Amino acid sequence: MSIKWEKKDGTNEGKLTFEIAPEKIKEGLNSAFNRVKKSLNVPGFRKGKVPRQIFNKMYGEEALYQEALNDLLPEAYSNAVKEADINPVDQPQIDVESMESDAAWVLTAKVTVEPEVELGQYKDLEVTKHPTRVLKADIENELNRLQQQEAELVLKEDEPAEQGDTVVIDFEGKIDGEAFDGGKGENHSLELGSGQFIPGFEDQLVGHKAGEEVAVTVTFPEDYQAKDLAGKEAVFDTKIHEVKTKELPELDDEFAKDVDEDVATLEELKAKIKDRLKDQKVAEAKAAIQEEALDIAVENATIGEIPAVMIEDDVHRQMDNFLAGMQNQGISADMYYQLTGTSADDLHKQFEEGAEKRVKTNLVLEAIVKAEKIEPSEDEINAEIKSLAEQYQMDEAAVRSALSDDMLKHDIAVRKVVDEIADSAKQTRDAKKDEE
């Protein structure tokens, strides 16, 4: 097939000229005729049994051209794109240049393609050093968290509430003396200092005892999710039923066994915590180095103007993934917007912020994959399928049928590039030394 790609200078647009060969046209016309004749009623012939020559005489072979083109175009365009070695980012605008019975059909496609990427340095980059040592303070903080988790709430008799205490309250909010939707609650447990309520609400309960009634005056934040309440002052009539304080367990062997049945002593628990924190710090350091190295690689690259459609596609992809995650938690898109007081436009704006960076990063990664000629092996593809099957609890055959080899190869190749960029990076900034 003869193809020609002409890119407009200074733009991401161009014209792709390509052909459909006569033998392919013949196959397409035969297929189109076999479909069309099934619905034809021609005098002297049973429905669907009209001969081809009679059809051509009555309607002309040209009557089959559009039907045949609809069949042939997807493959012809796809092959032309591959041969031209371009990466379209939007649906093409197809025009027919010539359609003759005994010659190749000639078509043109107005195509928007990915911007050109000129790679800069992406190996041996200098990045910040991320310490992975586990310090005594880290272990103590985790033990304190476990203590808080295992703490018991004990009633405070005739004692005022303090930060960190839990109060059980009834409340009803009013604006200008009028109650509003969502402003009332009964027997609600609230930890003071948790930030669960509007700023200022919890602070005004500190110093009060069980049985007392408190008028809590607050102002809703300007960016409050319920737009009709944003920026308004409200008074909450609040009745305190109970004040409870946390009673922390002793840090001893019994505590250790309570929080982890696989250990027998506090020292064993500390050792296990240290190992877990070490793994966590190593993983966090790896992620931070990857992110920093990628950012530098993108900065070092020269990237053409990003087509608007690429930004929009990324935003919609992020939105779809986010809402799918919500749906998996039983929250529909409409329910999410209602609960958060937002809209699809708000979510769109939220994901617009990082869209250009994400698109540029993907372009650079794909350029490196191409430059390094990275081609995942069959073993790597099989391992990826097995991993995905385990992750989503699916049959491996189902995963393979759901994902194309090209998609799997792309994901594996990009991941390998990210690892290679990070692994080659030099951690030049010394971390602050702390005692273990």
Swiss-Prot record:
PROSITE patterns: FKBP_PPIASE. It is found in: Cytoplasm. Its main location: cytoplasm. Gene3D superfamilies: 3.10.50.40, Trigger factor ribosome-binding domain, Trigger factor, C-terminal domain. One of its GO terms (biological process) is 'de novo' cotranslational protein folding. GO terms for cellular component: cytoplasm. Its EC number is 5.2.1.8. Involved in protein export. Acts as a chaperone by maintaining the newly synthesized protein in an open conformation. Functions as a peptidyl-prolyl cis-trans isomerase. Belongs to the FKBP-type PPIase family. Tig subfamily. Consists of 3 domains; the N-terminus binds the ribosome, the middle domain has PPIase activity, while the C-terminus has intrinsic chaperone activity on its own. NCBIfam families: tig. This is Trigger factor. The gene is tig.
